């Protein structure tokens, strides 16, 4: 006898539902006989009519047709292209509601994935002004009716939505990009056409130093030749004295990858500079640098607090990137060792250490799970281990290395609560106890949340 279950809904069916929760990407979740239906823009507690648009074996997708009751946290999105862009997922939710939803998400995965429901999870540290916080704008360029368009891809497509401004983007970047678009149009620069693999300008990127006010402009082109380059640069430099660097990156490949291999400075310096707290950073076109420096300082201050350094410790910073956390730690530690797999990031880390006259930070290139045991054999004994892995979390070999090395304290910075909970569980099974988790809202109006946890050896 077949045990195959038939989904309790059909495509194009209209049904009334109550939303119970939000998914990790911000969709409302309703259930019919335990069968989940995901609906964009639905909020917990709301009663609504939805239309079923796709039916799968274990779940369905619906479209919100009509609200019967509204959540007290619902609001109109402030961005006119919110429903098309996809850059933000939560503008229809008040900021207070966003912070509560993120806290609930972390509490849920800590229990469900990590079995750590007893660990204190502190409310999210949000922003006083959760707008215009991004210091980097990276926009595709297209052509429409003879003119250039610059903006963002329509959700799920490569159709460019022309945008004059983005409400989460630094106004300085928005203003510059709109003017660059006008100047390029005036000088006859063509936009890259993905289908025909023709045209010149693929993307424009602007990076803004929030503290210094310095701006870097990057042209990403299909060909090395940029027509009327000299006139374009002169006009931009005259109009925007805060632009300290203009760079061209050439990407001739038919690919979705934005950057190519060749980068050339056209004007000014290879770097702009910015500060997070008292630490100065040199930022190149390709450098990884946190896009919300105000909240990055909040995150790093909490990391430093959890590391509880008194000046006598040796600290290892795994996945150290350009050394941003390492240099924060080096302010208080005796010695910091940072490791990162990307060689260019380690060059940036060394440059940033020199820029801040920090001689107690040392950096190595390679996989953390390979380099750290090598250091251990050379006599580097970490009192405190700090990890800040990518979304996939820590490599299993690194977790085993930590358990074998037995640093007294581990501080785990995470951009993915699910992999954080998974990895904390492994560390707990290896002799550690998670003490607390602090959440930081680095990306308001999106579903992303940063966490920092600390564990002690028991």
Swiss-Prot record:
S-adenosyl-L-methionine binds at residues 290, 319, 340, 388. It comes from the Bacteria. GO terms for molecular function: 4 iron, 4 sulfur cluster binding; metal ion binding; rRNA (uridine-C5-)-methyltransferase activity. [4Fe-4S] cluster binds at residues 79, 85, 88, 166. Residues 8-66 form the TRAM domain. The keyword rRNA-binding does not apply. It holds the Pfam family tRNA_U5-meth_tr. GO terms for biological process: rRNA base methylation. Keywords: 4Fe-4S, Iron, Iron-sulfur, Metal-binding, Methyltransferase, S-adenosyl-L-methionine, Transferase. InterPro entries: MeTrfase_TrmA_AS (IPR030390), MeTrfase_TrmA_CS (IPR030391), NA-bd_OB-fold (IPR012340), SAM-dependent_MTases_sf (IPR029063), TRAM_dom (IPR002792), TRM5-TYW2-like_MTfase (IPR056743), U5_MeTrfase_fam (IPR010280). The keyword Repressor does not apply. PROSITE patterns: SAM_MT_RNA_M5U (PS51687), TRAM (PS50926), TRMA_1 (PS01230), TRMA_2 (PS01231). The active site is at residue 415. Its EC number is 2.1.1.-. Belongs to the class I-like SAM-binding methyltransferase superfamily. RNA M5U methyltransferase family. This is Uncharacterized RNA methyltransferase BA_0333/GBAA_0333/BAS0318. The lineage of its organism: Bacteria, Bacillati, Bacillota, Bacilli, Bacillales.
């Amino acid at each position: 006898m077949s045990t195959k279950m038939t989904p309790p809904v059909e495509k194009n069916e209209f049904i009334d539902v109550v939303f119970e929760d939000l998914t990790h990407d911000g969709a409302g979740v309703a259930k019919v006989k335990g069968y989940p239906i995901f609906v964009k823009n639905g909020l917990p507690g709301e009663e609504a009519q939805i239309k079923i648009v796709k039916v799968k074996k274990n779940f369905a997708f619906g479209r919100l047709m009509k609200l019967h009751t509204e959540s007290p946290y619902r609001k109109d999105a402030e961005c006119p292209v919110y429903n098309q862009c996809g850059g933000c997922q939560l503008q229809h939710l008040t900021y207070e509601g966003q912070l509560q939803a993120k806290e609930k998400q972390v509490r849920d995965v800590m229990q469900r994935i990590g079995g750590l429901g007893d660990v204190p999870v502190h409310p999210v540290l949000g922003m006083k002004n959760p707008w215009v916080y991004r210091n980097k704008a990276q926009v595709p360029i297209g052509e429409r009716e003879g003119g250039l368009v610059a903006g963002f891809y329509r959700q799920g497509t490569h159709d460019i939505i022309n945008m004059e401004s983005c409400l989460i983007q630094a106004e300085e970047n928005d203003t510059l990009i709109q003017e660059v678009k006008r100047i390029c149009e005036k000088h006859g620069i063509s936009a890259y056409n993905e289908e025909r693999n023709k045209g010149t300008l693929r993307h424009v990127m602007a990076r803004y130093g929030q503290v210094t006010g310095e701006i870097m402009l990057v042209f990403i082109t299909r060909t090395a030749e940029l027509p009327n380059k000299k006139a374009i640069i002169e006009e931009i430099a005259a109009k925007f004295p805060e632009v300290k660097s203009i760079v061209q990156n050439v990407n001739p490949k038919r690919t979705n990858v934005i950057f190519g291999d060749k980068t050339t400075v056209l004007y000014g310096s290879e770097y702009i500079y910015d500060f997070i707290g008292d630490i100065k950073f040199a930022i190149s076109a390709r450098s990884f640098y946190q896009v919300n420096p105000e909240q990055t300082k909040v995150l790093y201050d909490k990391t430093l607090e959890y590391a509880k350094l008194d000046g006598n410790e040796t600290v290892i910073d795994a996945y150290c990137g350009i050394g941003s956390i390492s240099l924060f730690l080096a302010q208080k530690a005796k010695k910091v060792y940072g490791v990162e797999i990307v060689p260019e990031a380690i060059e940036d880390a060394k440059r940033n250490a020199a820029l801040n006259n920090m001689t107690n930070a040392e950096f190595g290139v390679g996989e953390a799970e390979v380099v750290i045991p090598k250091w251990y054999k050379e006599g580097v004994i970490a009192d405190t281990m700090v990890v800040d892995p990518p979304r996939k979390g820590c490599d299993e070999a690194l977790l085993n290395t930590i358990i074998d090395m037995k640093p007294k304290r581990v501080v785990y910075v995470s951009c993915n609560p699910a992999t954080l909970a998974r990895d904390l569980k492994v560390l707990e099974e290896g002799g550690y106890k998670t003490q607390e988790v602090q959440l930081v809202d680095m990306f308001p109006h999106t579903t992303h949340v940063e966490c920092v946890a600390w564990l002690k050896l028991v």
